[in-house]
Swiss-Prot record:
GO molecular function: erythrose-4-phosphate dehydrogenase activity; NAD binding
Subcellular locations according to the entry: Cytoplasm
Enzyme class: oxidoreductase
Residues annotated for substrate binding in this entry: 153-155, 199, 212-213, 235
EC numbers on record: 1.2.1.72
GO cellular component terms attached to this protein's record: cytoplasm
Name listed for the protein in its UniProt record: D-erythrose-4-phosphate dehydrogenase
CDD domains listed in its UniProt record: GAPDH_C_E4PDH, GAPDH_N_E4PDH
Organism: Shewanella putrefaciens (strain CN-32 / ATCC BAA-453)
Residue positions binding NAD(+): 11-12, 317
Keyword terms: Cytoplasm, NAD, Oxidoreductase, Pyridoxine biosynthesis
Amino acid sequence: MIRVAINGYGRIGRSILRALYESGKRQQIQIVAINELAKPEAIIHLTQYDTTHGRFQHKVKLVDNHMLIGDDAIKILHEPDAAKLPWREMDIDIVYEATGVILDRQSCEAHIHAGAKQVLISHPSSADVDGTIVYGVNHDLLRAGHTVVSNASCTTNCIVPVIDVLDKHFGVKSGAITTIHSAMNDQQVIDAYHDDLRRTRAAGQSIIPVDTKLARGIERILPHMKDKFEAISVRVPTINVTAIDLSVTLAKTVDIASVNQVLELAANGRFNGILGYTDEPLVSCDFNHDPRSSIVDGTQTRVSAGQLVKLLLWCDNEWGFANRMLDTSLAMIAAKQS
């Protein structure tokens, strides 16, 4: 049994916990502790009730500063200094680092010094970590000596499996990406101050361009794609599910049917459970709570002049990513034991 702790219990932290109990991986992973500065009553309430994902299927109670879920008792901590967390006493194998602010190796090593054996960051990180993993594409690079690993981003997990499939079958020469991302909690409900002037504006009233490092994230997973991609991102007034508009120039001549065929085969084969394919006339809310990293919308595939291909990809940017956190952590332990 892997003993884990969650540091930072926001959207991703709570999704990780709920995904664990819904995924069938609870027999492999035990959440021992949650470190979150919010009040325990709020932690319990937001675990039980969620606007996006609905009510948690298990009853959650607060007893003696523990979250009780069935027979499981999860210690609730409120420690702002990661170096002071009781990971050694709790025998923590992996910390899910989900604060969104501890993103480099030196900061993550505070967890290691506190006694945790490994750290998995739920965010793109600095380049000095042991590895940035998109599960299903490069998790085989994990090694026993890796202590600090990044799970990349939800959009990197969405797009990289698709690029990988296209490159292996047709060769990818270059690409351009537009991420159409649901609003996030770094935006404002009504106009208010923010360092990014666009994010001073009400999230529910505008389509808001934001910076993205997605293209650089692709390069970290697929180094041979260096300088071949650029990306922009806009936030839209929905609370969950993201679409990615991907345009790629291929080395081989293709048509819509051949592109869709290789993606559907990959979804049913090598990337089963990670990549999906649909030809139904669906909309974003239909992918809410979908555990896969990416779903190709085959109805929107377009080909121009035989080599320029446009695709529409969907992902639940919370739930799919949380499930990959679980998968990557299991792969880290497997590598450590090999």
